[in-house]
Amino acid sequence: MHRRTLVKPLLAALLAAAVLASCGKNATAPRPVDHSLRAVLGRTLTEHHLPAIAGAVVRSDSIAEIAVLGVRKLGAPDSVTLSDHFHLGSNVKAMTADLLAMEVEAGRLAWDRTLAQIFPEFADSMRVEYRGVTLEALLQHRSGLPAFTDPAELTAVPDFTGTLEERRQAAARWLLRQPPGGPVGQYLYSNAGYALAGVILERSAGASWESLIQTRLWAPLGIAGGFGWPAAGGAPQPWGHFDAGSGRLVPQDPDDPDGQFPDLLRPAGDAHLSVGDYARFARLHLRALRGHPELLSAATFQRLHTANGSYAMGWGVQPVGGATTWFHAGSAGTFGAIVMIQPGRDIAVVVLTNAGSNEAVLAAQDAAIELLAH
């Protein structure tokens, strides 16, 4: 029985490693290399022994290329299809940020509203360090809230009762009484911060995070997504695979009670989409970065995409191959998701895999960088 990790903070270390690994990698190739999407995915699948991999190359006017390769589960014959879903992990954070931006545009929230103002009924009981944290700082991982990237951190969380929304509200009250994980104002990747952001969204909009993401974000984009593991309940979908040691990938039972994503943390990273649908989400942000916003105003998208240091709201921002790139990496230990956007070159790339080891996610990032370069 495998107790998988929570959504892991892969951004800085893995992207830096991928950038270094890609520098000059193809410039001195002794023979021509096929850089088409299917060829890049095929090499990645074979060289890293992945169960399956999916990817798309996106332009502002279309999804230019899309492909899936491999099997749903190691040791089983079923091949993946374009309609199969992959778990996104932390790449869901950008979606949660978009939903909060909608509340800001509606006038029900403000970027500079503090946690004390958002939760006035228990402002006096929350730790003083958190009272002045703004919504914007929360989404930029500068709240000081603990990371919550390890299942062991959840053992201290009480078993709250009530509806899902009531339990999330109680968890927010509890969380804001806990010691900070680091100095407020400094970058500290925090799943707890985005869990709290989900509570703020639910309070403001008067509906669950799950219903809001489906009706306000996915439906307008033509996306059909879900929550939890894609193959839960016997669904004919990809299984996730975890690293059992020495790089050996083992299927994770999607119905194992010890392997479920905590619903309190769902806004931080628990949703699954097909590669085509995730490409549609990437295209939304590519078009916005190129001055063609949908669902939100140009000014709001600019705010979402403006980095404080190297992280904006749900997006890392860093040069890749000489071009400013908005990116994110997500994994809850059994799947991996990569998105990279270069608006200056009118391109976005998404790569998904049903393996969650660090090697697998790094391989997916290498593939994405190769696709960006060609």
Language model features: what each stretch is:
Residues 34-86, 110:
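Short, conserved catalytic-motif segment at the N-terminal edge
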Residues 110-126, 220-221:
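Short, glycine/proline-biased beta-turn/loop segments that scaffold the active-site neighborhood
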Residues 328, 336-355:
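Short, well-ordered beta-strand elements
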